[in-house]
Amino acid sequence: MARKYFGTDGIRGRVGQFPITPDFMLKLGWAAGMAFRKEGKCRILIGKDTRISGYMFESALEAGLAAAGADVQLLGPMPTPAIAYLTRTFQADAGIVISASHNPHDDNGIKFFSNEGTKLPDDVEAMIEELLDQPMTVVESAGIGKASRINDASGRYIEFCKGSVPSGTSFKGLKIVIDCAHGAAYKVAPSVFRELGAEVRVISAQPDGLNINDGCGSTHIAALQAEVVAQQADLGIAFDGDADRVLMVDQYGAVVDGDELLFIIARDLQERGRLRGGVVGTLMSNLGLELALAELNIPFVRAKVGDRYVIAELLARNWQLGGENSGHLVCFQHTTTGDAIIAALQVLMALKRRGQSLVEARSDLKKCPQVLVNVRLSGAVDPLEHPSVKEACARVTERMAGRGRVLLRKSGTEPLVRVMVEGDEESSVRGYADELAKIVAEVCA
């Protein structure tokens, strides 16, 4: 059954436009409290990224939860994976994240974690949606929930991240630049890498509520590229606003994407006999990743785009490693969800074990040229079902003669159609992508 409010990654939209409004968040808090409350009280953790609207929505959610009889513990600005970890280790009934991830400050959203620090099951989301359509009530005065703050949350998470590498590990002699996207990782990420011995230069770590993801972070990586070269650093690490995505930059300023990072981690695990099963990618994963893993006899399967689908496929197969080329990387040997800091640490450990630079480590993956064009979606027409779009896709696929792929899909978080073309020659791939994007745009006009 189609969900009314929840998308592929929770509830997300423009601040001030339904459902990203204070009154809806009040009702959402109440509905969540009612859904998680079993017999008597329940306890819910709330964390957020650094966007200014987070304070407003935190208060609204807190009030709604209290009205349902739920106690609330506030974490303040924290990476999304930290909230998953703390929900589990504090044995809370659920965790709530206030974030729109890599989106600009005027967007925001809500996502939930179960008591195990995993994505919320579909049946629980369905229960919350059902409650949202019912009248809001308030428990008896004596049963109203209480709110408190957890003051040592950052320190707990920093130690957890450091614990994902072997005891005694030192990155002394490694010079890195970290781009925190003016987001949730601005305090914890520099501390993790510094405490492990690395020389750290930090950029985009002065959040003001409005500058999150603004020309920085994993979606705007040019500033990090320039800083790595200027500082003559060994590599750069870029997080997004809620630190569940990571990309890297090598010493020459070249971007190392999620496919390449996934390959480096997978090869390291296999060489140490620690890789359980294979690797899960997505429909957007580069064909080069699939071929490179095949050379290592590592199984590879593709899930739908979205970390929730990668995670679902990993769980179904009892595998432990998966991710997206956008930088969502899931290392189940350490975490219950995608964690950018921990994924970056696994890459650094792989480099350390092999005695390689990032340039050397990525060289065994030969990526096929891939072009992605985003087309703004407007109107009621579904371009993916339009005859002219289908005919164009078939025509391009035929012209590529089995030497490439065409994929059109709607974004799960933004009003966009993503047009992806992959093949063995960049100029033709670009031409095909532009051709398809033009047709999609005409249909959407």
Curated annotation (Swiss-Prot):
Q: List positions binding Mg(2+).
A: 101, 240, 242, 244
Q: Which organism is it from?
A: Ectopseudomonas mendocina (strain ymp)
Catalytic activity field: alpha-D-glucosamine 1-phosphate = D-glucosamine 6-phosphate
Cofactor(s) needed by this chain = Mg(2+)
Modification note:
Activated by phosphorylation.
Cofactor: record remark: Binds 1 Mg(2+) ion per subunit.
Which SUPFAM superfamilies does its entry note?
Answer: Phosphoglucomutase, C-terminal domain (SSF55957), Phosphoglucomutase, first 3 domains (SSF53738)
Classification of source organism: Bacteria, Pseudomonadati, Pseudomonadota, Gammaproteobacteria, Pseudomonadales
CDD domains in the record, alphabetically?
GlmM (cd05802)
Q: Write the signal peptide boundaries.
A: none
Q: GO CC terms on record?
A: cytosol
State one molecular function term (GO).
phosphoglucosamine mutase activity
Put simply, this protein is called Phosphoglucosamine mutase
Q: In UniProt terms, what function does this protein have?
A: Catalyzes the conversion of glucosamine-6-phosphate to glucosamine-1-phosphate.
- InterPro entries per record: A-D-PHexomutase_a/b/a-I, A-D-PHexomutase_a/b/a-I/II/III, A-D-PHexomutase_a/b/a-II, A-D-PHexomutase_a/b/a-III, A-D-PHexomutase_C, A-D-PHexomutase_C_sf, A-D-PHexomutase_CS, Alpha-D-phosphohexomutase_SF
